[in-house]
């Protein structure tokens, strides 16, 4: 496996990052209820061995760099069970995430149910 570089930041992605094509996105929360539970971390992977962990302190949801990436129509955001991640990102950051690709839905569509 190739080396992975993990970058950690508070409340937003660093300014000046550029991505092309697609990024993988995942969130970590304090629970599974969108209206009740807080977004703690948003993870972004570029598929080239870099991962950014954005840790939210619960007081600053402005995240202009992360919002710009999540709303960028030229970059596909890849999720697994995106329904929850997209909802929690919209609830806390107020961003409409698009375009998206959900690997959970794709796996159900591609399933052949054969031996």
Spans of features found by a protein language model:
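N-terminal accessory regions of nucleic-acid-interacting proteins
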Residues: 1-23, 27
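Active-site-proximal helix-loop-helix substrate-binding element of RNase H-like nuclease domains
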Residues: 3, 43-115
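Short N-terminal binding/cap micro-motifs at the start of the first secondary-structure element
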Residues: 14, 32-35
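A generic structural signal for short beta-strands and their flanking turns/coil linkers
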Residues: 21, 38-40, 50
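Non-catalytic, usually N-terminal nucleic-acid engagement modules in DNA/RNA processing proteins
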Residues: 24, 33, 41-47
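Flexible glycine-rich surface loops and low-complexity tracts that mediate binding to linear polymers
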Residues: 25-29, 80-81
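Short, glycine/acidic-enriched loop or turn micro-motifs at the edges of active sites
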Residues: 29-31, 105
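Short, glycine/acidic-enriched capping/hinge loops at junctions between secondary-structure elements
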Residues: 34-38, 53-55
């Amino acid at each position: 496996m190739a080396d992975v570089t993990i970058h950690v930041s508070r409340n937003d992605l660093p300014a000046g990052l550029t991505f092309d094509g697609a990024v993988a996105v995942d969130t970590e929360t304090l629970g599974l209820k969108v209206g009740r539970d807080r977004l703690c971390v948003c993870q972004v992977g570029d598929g080239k061995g870099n991962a950014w962990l954005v840790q939210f302190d619960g007081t600053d949801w402005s995240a202009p760099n992360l919002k710009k990436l999540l709303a960028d129509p030229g970059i596909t955001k890849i999720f697994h069970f995106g329904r929850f991640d997209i909802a929690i990102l919209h609830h806390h950051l107020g961003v409409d995430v698009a375009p998206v690709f959900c690997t959970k839905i794709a796996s159900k569509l591609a399933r052949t149910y054969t031996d």
